[in-house]
Amino acid sequence: MSAYRWFALFACLAMSGCASFGEDFVSMFSTQGERELDVGVRAYEDGEYAYSARLLQGSLDAGLRGTSNRVRAHKYLAFIYCTSNRVPQCRDEFRKALEVNPSFTLLEDESGHPIWGPVYRSLKPRKK
């Protein structure tokens, strides 16, 4: 076996022994804001809305990089505000997301949501 094959075999064995290697490797190059965004989205998915909102806002305050990351943070903040009946804050977060990326659209199942769907649609002009 060539040295490259041995190296590939060793690398596969080493990585199979630690499932979180990929996450650990990526987190080495992530900013604080990106890590807070990821944890904030997971907290949202777990129903921890107050904690999620703190993390999402913290990610933005930390200078979150990347258009898609900033839009994602604003979108989840909007969801949290809408579900807690804070419609003006919800609208403001959707507005901020659209300022970051005017092409921002919700997924089909998100835009049809009975609480935040109408708020989002009130800000997003319809295509003719």
Each language-model region and where it sits:
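Boundary/linker segments of alpha-helical solenoid repeat arrays
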Residues: 66-70, 99-114, 119
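Amphipathic alpha-helical segments of tetratricopeptide repeats
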Residues: 58-61, 98-99
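Bacterial Sec signal peptide processing site at the extreme N-terminus
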Residues: 14-35, 39
